[in-house]
């Protein structure tokens, strides 16, 4: 028998539960279509600790996409590949010079897999993602500290520039390997821009800094996470959700009216009977003429036959149907 059972928490909306009757259920297909399944999955696992309740809002989702995926990850990839393309035509030279700014970034990148593994083993997915994005943040700060645009002004500093870009690309590769369980489609796009071979996408390769060849070829590609205009997007989502809520309320209206209508028993009202067609009235009278129904079992054989006793009264053309109805009622 299992010794531990893990369960996820509740996903709340504005502090309350979601329900179809309220018409406030968040449509995951709509969000995945607008922002990608990778972005939605990242947000849910990054913001909501496993096993705890989480409060969802469109604003939180958009802010997380803009801050982490657009500003940090997407910006780091775009800057790295764009500078490699601009200064070296995408092909980093073999001759490279290290600098004092390298040590801190390389230390963080080399120890990332062990920290990530410990968090994943503890089901602390939000911490594992935080570890990865801490290194991504350090890489963005590394760009500011080394100022590649300044190094590019002198031919003498080109080897140093090449090393800076290599360190950025290799750091990105390690982070991307570890992000694969969360954002598989996005990671393949990043690998393509970094020109990473199959052996550079493995779990083992994330523990070593230097898997990319020194003369790596980088490809400037599409912006994997364009920044979202939050105000405009929130207004559009509000309109879409209002339409969905109205549709849900309209769909529930007939059922609610049916529940509120009192159930009728006994004979039909005089008004209903007067309005009914002759054949329907005859059948109604025939049903009410049934005073007694008894199941009679014929003996003498294994076969059993049901007979129905009733008082006369039904119209001849309704007799069979009334008998069947009486039989059903007896059962």
Q: Could you tell me what each predicted segment is?
A:
Residues 4-7, 191-192, 276:
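Beta-strand segments within the central parallel beta-sheet cores of soluble alpha/beta enzyme folds
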Residues 9-103, 194-232:
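Catalytic adenosine-cofactor/nucleotide-binding cores of aminoacyl-tRNA synthetases and other
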Residues 55-69, 111-130:
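Extended, non-catalytic structural segments that build the interaction scaffolds
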Residues 73, 132, 184:
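Residue-level signal for inorganic ion chemistry
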Residues 89-117, 143-245:
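Acidic, turn-prone loop/beta-hairpin segments
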Residues 104, 130-145:
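Core structural elements
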Residues 235-272:
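Acidic, low-complexity intrinsically disordered tails
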Residues 263, 268-331:
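Phosphate-backbone binding interfaces of nucleic-acid-interacting proteins
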């Amino acid at each position: 028998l299992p010794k531990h059972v893990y369960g996820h928490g509740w996903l709340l909306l504005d502090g309350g539960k979601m329900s179809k009757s309220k018409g406030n259920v968040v449509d995951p297909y709509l969000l995945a279509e607008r922002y990608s399944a990778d972005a939605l999955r990242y947000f849910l696992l990054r913001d909501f600790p496993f096993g705890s309740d989480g409060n969802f809002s469109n604003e939180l989702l958009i802010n997380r996409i803009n801050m982490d995926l657009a500003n940090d990850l997407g910006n780091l990839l775009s800057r790295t590949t764009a500078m490699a393309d601009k200064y070296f035509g995408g092909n980093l030279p073999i001759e490279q010079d290290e600098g004092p700014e390298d040590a801190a970034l390389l230390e963080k990148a080399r120890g990332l897999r062990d920290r990530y593994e410990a968090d994943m083993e503890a089901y602390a997915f939000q911490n594992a993602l935080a570890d990865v994005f801490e290194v991504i943040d350090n890489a963005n700060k590394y760009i500011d500290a080394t100022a590649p645009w300044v190094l590019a002004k002198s031919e003498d500093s080109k080897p140093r520039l090449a090393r800076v870009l290599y360190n950025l690309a290799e750091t990105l590769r390690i982070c991307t390997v570890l992000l694969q369980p969360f954002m598989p489609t996005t990671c393949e796009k990043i690998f393509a821009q970094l020109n990473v071979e199959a052996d550079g996408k493995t779990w083992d390769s994330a523990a070593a800094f230097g898997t990319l060849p020194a003369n790596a070829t980088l490809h400037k590609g599409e912006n994997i996470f364009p920044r979202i205009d939050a105000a405009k997007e929130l207004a559009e989502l509000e309109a879409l959700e209002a339409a969905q809520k109205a549709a849900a309320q309209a769909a529930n209206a007939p059922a609610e009216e049916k529940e509120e209508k009192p159930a009728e028993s006994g004979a039909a009202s005089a008004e209903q009977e007067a309005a009914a067609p002759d054949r329907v009235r005859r059948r109604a009278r025939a049903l009410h003429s049934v005073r007694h129904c008894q199941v009679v079992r014929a003996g003498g054989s294994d076969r059993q036959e049901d007979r129905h006793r009733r008082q006369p009264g039904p119209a001849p053309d309704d007799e069979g149907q009334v008998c069947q109805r009486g039989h059903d009622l007896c059962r």
